[in-house]
Amino acid sequence: MEYINFEHNETAAELVRAAYDTPPLAFVHSYGCQQNVNDGERIKGVLVDIGYGLCDKPEDADLILFNTCAVREHAEQRVFGNVGALKGLKEKKRGLMIGLCGCMANQKHVVEKLRKSYPYVDLVFGVDGIDTLPQLIAQKLQKHKRVLMEPAQRPVIVENIPIRRESEFRAWLPIMYGCDNFCTYCIVPYVRGREKSRKPGDILAEFRGLVEAGYKEITLLGQNVNSYGKGLEEQVDFADLLNLLCAVPGDYQIRFMTSHPKDASHKLIDAIAAQPHLCKHLHLPVQCGSDELLKKMNRHYTIGQYMELIEYARKKVPGITFSSDIIVGFPGETEEDFQGTLELVKKVGYMQLFTFIYSKRTGTKAAEMPDPTPRAEKTDRMTRLLKVQDEIAMDLVRQQVGRTVRVLVEGYGRSDGTLSGRLDNNLTVEFAADPALMGSYAQVHLTGARATVLLGELET
């Protein structure tokens, strides 16, 4: 693995200045996961570094970039539709540059489709190419030809890429990239590549800078944060990294995502228990409640092992809450398998579930598996699952009433005159307060609940 630092490209900056009568504007739209959102922030930072301003409407832009997601095929089709809708704008606006980057651009069939069917797309580069964007723009401006990079995964981590963060008090901080798990339903390892971890010193430096800049919540990102450290010269795992970061003085809290159950450890739970800066919430995607299906998914754990981890966390971290991902209707799922999922959901008592009806993803092993279950039956199972989960979540929320809690105030609530914030257990509360509190911590007494949203009163 090679570690390099981003360098300002003055040649690109000069070409950008020369190409436009007024400072050009860029519109960047990111689809998908939090990692993509963070990539989008870095893309914006790189563009600003070579002289672009940023705008919120594509029709105002001189450069339009779609930072894409490849997890689901219908998401890809939506992107192609949005790119197609720009054809007329491209014809009307002289010099408009259109680009597509991110996970979709790391697939050969996508690049070929763009090459053949979308001649007005000027730039294409993958997830590892953010630091090369100035060079690609310079090449386009110099040669006036399309620059479509072939999919490639670089054994490189680029540090100190400029960034334009969307929030002034919440920040994303990637600690690793890629995934080695190859779950049979998932395209991510094929488009984001194998796992590669940032050096702990580089992470610590960025983290310390965020704390010193006043950020109140920092979320550590990785496709599987629990496997952090593999391949590093230093013997450091994810729990070690958390303890290292929590030693930084300041008023902040840390979240992280995503945890893979096969790599989650007692050592991680012990860190959550010991460190006040770590939020007492664990997102632990189980996917289903059937050992047989977990094996078909290539998840490498059993329901028994998963429950042992849940029970250990409950014992060590009083009040900890859990969330998870569930796939309904995976190929071969029987009613008995689904009942296992319902039982697991009831047993764990998740505060929140992210649920999906299985959709075939070309390029994955699951796409080749027989899938005889009718769509209507899958939809019925999803309805039953959501009913069970809604009852569990509402009951857990009601149990919070009466507590006085520390809340990070994030924005406006749904009701007039209210603000919204999150507890460290990831629940949302609304309360009347001055908007000046946004981005700070507040003490809130929980007085009631509306469905899965808590209601409270500001403590003064």
Give the ranges of each region predicted by the language model:
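Short flexible coil/turn linkers enriched for glycine and charged/polar residues
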Residues: 166-169, 179-181, 278, 288, ...
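Conserved, mostly hydrophobic/aromatic
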Residues: 183, 220, 256, 284, ...
